[in-house]
Regions:
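Bacterial N-terminal signal peptides that target proteins for export
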Residues: 2-11
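Low-complexity, intrinsically disordered/propeptide-like segments
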Residues: 6, 18-20, 332, 343
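C-terminal segment of classical bacterial N-terminal signal peptides
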Residues: 17-27
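Flexible loop/hinge segments at secondary-structure junctions
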Residues: 26-442
């Protein structure tokens, strides 16, 4: 079968493409109305952007090429057609995804689901409740990925003359963002990098997200556990208004990681420390190219962006030590898998008010310390503002993404599969979806 003739894929800035399906490869999802027409769109976290984009294409290819999974391709059309099903995701950041979820366009074709890497705060849950969105909802983990600490230091060499890899730990990363560590040759950084010959006497250009970000949530979740000074000195709390509050906000038992832009919540502290302001960029896709183009810059991105832009990635100290010595790890499939196996997670998709715990700073000498889930929010009931076929199409895609889509064949470089038990619980939530009160996938 000629895929190019059967389905013509068009990916726009909003990651839009046409899908032609009557089921997924495993045959478990509902059959889609052959006359189904319309969009299936969501918004939110940029952490999973590369994976969602890749899934869209793979899903289309899988169902076009696998015998028996498509009854008749004649019923499906391209994304620029007036008929057919069109799947899209516009990004915008986790905060945008959450606010859109209970916004004016909720439960319509342009807002059928949202992505977030951050838990719903009590304020956000109260806003959803006050809005009365007209239905219950679920929050499921869609994909897992590590955060990479990325940097550019031109000409960094080992004492033997080879290209050097920077080592960092929670305290040094915290110090860099606080502004207590201003230069690359600071004694704290040098102590972690005895084999690096030429750490420069250059000011560190600290970069962070300018938008409300779930990636920042994962980052601050890590610092809250990994940096001994983070609880009271890193100031990562959404409600502080002064440097005093920032320095004294939370103890270890009540630490609350946030999505707030680093340039905002570190501003007073950095000024007090005589450090320059943090450079803010929107989205993982805004930070990665900036770091690539800027010598002496440092930031944090989902690891797929580090790969995509060929960025230098720091080796970060694991929680566990080997024979009393720190172990430094980079984000790989193996180190992420070790972290997920060791991490304790608290997940209850039937109760979205549950604080989902990001699997950061897991024990084990092989556990990469900055790993996070990216969650997907969807409504339990979709009204007549969308068609049954659109809801069927969304369920079919999500079921595929949580099953076949988690295999190495379909994972974009820099992402990892979620644990099987987690995916099984997520798929169970799809069976709760109704259209006008009627269960879509019994």
């Amino acid at each position: 079968m000629n895929l190019a003739k059967s389905i013509r894929v068009s990916i726009t800035a909003a990651l839009v493409l046409a899908i032609g399906i009557s089921g997924v490869a495993n045959g478990a999802a509902p059959t889609i109305d052959p006359n189904a027409v319309g969009k299936i769109e969501g918004s939110g976290a940029t952490f999973p952007w590369n994976q969602y984009k890749d899934w869209f294409t793979s899903f289309t290819d899988e169902n076009a090429d696998t015998a028996g999974t498509v009854a008749s391709l004649a019923q499906f059309h391209t994304s620029n057609s007036t008929s057919g099903l069109v799947l899209g995701y516009s990004g915008g950041g986790s905060s945008t995804g959450i606010s859109n979820f209970f916004g004016a366009n909720r439960r319509t074709a342009t807002q059928m689901f949202s992505g977030t890497d951050a838990v719903l705060t009590s304020t956000q849950r109260a806003s959803i409740a006050a809005t009365d969105i007209g239905t219950k909802y679920s929050v499921i983990p869609a994909i897992t990925g590590p955060l990479a600490i990325v940097y550019r230091i031109d000409g960094l060499k080992t004492t033997g003359g080879a290209k050097a890899t920077l080592r960092l730990d929670g305290n040094t990363i915290c110090g860099i963002y606080l502004g207590t560590i201003k230069k690359w040759n600071d004694t704290a950084i040098k102590a972690l990098n005895p084999s690096v010959a030429n750490l420069p006497n250059a000011t560190i250009n600290v970069v962070g997200r300018s938008d409300g970000s779930g990636t920042t949530f994962v980052f601050t979740s890590y610092l809250g556990k990994a940096a001994t000074t983070a609880q009271k000195n890193c100031g990562m709390h959404s409600n502080f208004t002064s440097s005093t509050e920032a320095n004294l906000n939370d103890d270890a038992g009540t630490f609350t990681p946030v999505t707030t832009a680093p340039g905002t919540y570190f501003s007073a502290i950095r000024t007090a420390n005589g450090a320059a302001a943090i450079t803010g960029k929107s989205g993982n896709g805004g930070i990665a190219p900036y770091v690539k183009a800027t010598n002496n810059a440092i930031s944090y991105v989902e690891a797929s962006y580090a790969s995509k832009y060929s960025l230098s990635t720091a080796a970060v100290a694991a929680q566990s030590k080997r024979n009393g010595a720190k172990v430094y790890l980079q984000p790989t499939t193996a180190t992420v898998a070790a972290a997920l196996k060791a991490a304790a997670t608290v997940e209850d998709p039937t109760n979205p008010s549950t604080a989902f715990v990001q699997p950061v700073y897991a024990t084990g000498v092989n556990s990469y310390p900055i790993v996070g889930y990216s969650w997907l929010m969807f409504y339990h009931d979709y009204p007549s503002t969308v068609t049954l076929g659109q809801v069927q199409g969304m369920i079919a895609f999500l079921n595929w993404a949580l099953t076949d889509g988690q295999s190495s064949m379909y994972l974009y470089k820099g992402y990892s599969p979620t644990p099987q038990s987690t995916r099984a619980a997520a798929i169970a939530e799809l069976h709760k979806i109704t259209h006008n009160g009627v269960v879509v996938w019994p």
